[in-house]
Amino acid sequence: MIKKIFALPVIEQISPVLSRRKLDELDLIVVDHPQVKASFALQGAHLLSWKPAGEEEVLWLSNNTPFKNGVAIRGGVPVCWPWFGPAAQQGLPAHGFARNLPWTLKSHHEDADGVALTFELTQSEETKKFWPHDFTLLAHFRVGKTCEIDLESHGEFETTSALHTYFNVGDIAKVSVSGLGDRFIDKVNDAKENVLTDGIQTFPDRTDRVYLNPQDCSVINDEALNRIIAVGHQHHLNVVGWNPGPALSISMGDMPDDGYKTFVCVETAYASETQKVTKEKPAHLAQSIRVAKR
């Protein structure tokens, strides 16, 4: 899917390294820079791919995901906002509406090290169908040898949220994650609280855990691709570790049956409590990613 994105015809050359393209129904922004290749969907301000020069793709994007208006994209970095997980009210979209609506590219800046982009979403008649509040939501990205994401929300309300990042791995059976802390809510086991005793999370089957006292950096150890991905978290309360395992993967129409084998989600989140936003104090949720050899 990522190769397909970079082979799409250019609709508009925004700058020497930025272009607008289209895949099915969705407008894309493609970054082709000497230090980095990356792509975004305007729907959801959704980072689809990020590949620093000389590295394998860092993010995972499903080959089966549709690129259709209002349909969530499977992979990359979905922005879950203004709620994380199932909605409190029946009939509302899981993980909020921000990932399903078109955003505006507000600014971009390029230099020798990479590209910075800011996307914006504000209240509209469409958002008021889901949520009564006025808001401005900004998604700041800096892509180069590292990837930095900052979700900034303005208004008067409370939210839960996550940067639901899908990381590309060689083989989930040879992946471990450290730096998650010990206490977690096990969503596969009736949301019971449990403890990770050895500090190392592996993924032998379906895994869905909300860690309650994570460290500021989670480390993905990928034996098959012989690399380490360091995931920094800022302004967060939780880190979520997720992989659907074989049975759920088969049931998901937007994922290959064996899709679970080649990704792991390590998510920067504010999920177990609400985050308060005031006019005097905007809220942030931020993630930074870097890659190194094992």
UniProtKB/Swiss-Prot annotation:
Its EC number is 5.1.3.15. One of its GO terms (biological process) is DNA damage response. Keywords: Isomerase. Monomer in solution. Belongs to the glucose-6-phosphate 1-epimerase family. PANTHER family: APOSPORY-ASSOCIATED PROTEIN C-RELATED, GLUCOSE-6-PHOSPHATE 1-EPIMERASE. This is Putative glucose-6-phosphate 1-epimerase. It comes from Escherichia coli (strain K12). The gene is yeaD.
